[in-house]
Amino acid sequence: SRNQMVLDLSRDEVCEYVINAVSDILANANIGYAKRDMIRQLTDMPRLGYNHEYTLGYYKIMSAITEKFPNILFEGCSAGGGRFDAGVLAYMPQIWTSDNSDAIARLKMQYSTSMCYPVYSISSHVTASPNHQCGRDTSLKTRADVAYCGTFGYELDVTKMSDEEFEEIKAQIKFEKRIQDLMCNGDLYRLINPYETNYCSWEVVSKDKKHIFVMACKVLAVAQTKSEKVKLQGLDTNKQYRNTFTGKVYSGDFLMYHGIRANYEMKDFSTV
């Protein structure tokens, strides 16, 4: 139980207490962002349907608080995806996908979560490497490439970063701002399933089909093999698309029906 007790949110007086207590804190500090991090599960429920009553109480609390503080960004917490909830997105537009922020582990998490929830609701951050949970060492590029397809952010100790890493982060933030509208309003396509192959790829296409973002990842380096071809989806077959990194131009028809082989580095955990 993590030394935690659960408040009975099925009771109106408890909900009012929480609303008043949280509102008092938010009203007396310069707060622009708040994350609700709830890890304790419900056990020994007193009656059938109690979990539903509890959820309605939680919605009541968040409805009151967000109405009082419309300029604060609230983020939910998932504990591995279990608390992603379409209803709570009315109050918290983004949810922390998992405390496991390792970029390679996140491939499957974000791929799966995106089947039910929009890209802009999936909190995905660049965190320190080696990862604090699994010890995996991934490049700053790989961590950012995976995190772009979500809310994007950084969670690491900047005092331990080199000047070169700071410059790389500046470039990443500049790029993220370019694709921000695309991630919020574009259409997502899952191209390569990481559960079935050594690769993962997804794509976001703007509504007018003029702009696309594609991420492709090779999980493990394998000797004497060609990378899996990536075939895009949802493009205009009559349009020409320019790769902003290489300058190469491809037709939408070519990208969808012929596809391209990603130019991965010869190492594990490589992204393009």
Give each language-model segment a name.
Residues 141-192:
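Catalytic cores of secreted or luminal carbohydrate-active enzymes
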Residues 40, 78-80, 153, 208, ...:
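A broadly conserved detector of short glycine/acidic/proline-rich loop/turn motifs that flank catalytic sites
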Residues 5, 70-72, 93, 145, ...:
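Structural beta-strand/beta-sheet cores of well-ordered domains, especially the beta-sheet scaffolds
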Residues 220-272:
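C-terminal beta-sandwich/jelly-roll accessory domains of carbohydrate-active enzymes
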Residues 2-141, 151-166:
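Active-site neighborhood of glycoside hydrolase catalytic domains
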Residues 194-237:
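Carbohydrate-binding surface patches
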Residues 52-55, 59-82, 87-88, 171, ...:
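C-terminal extensions
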Residues 37, 74, 147, 214, ...:
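Hydrophobic, well-ordered secondary-structure elements that form the walls
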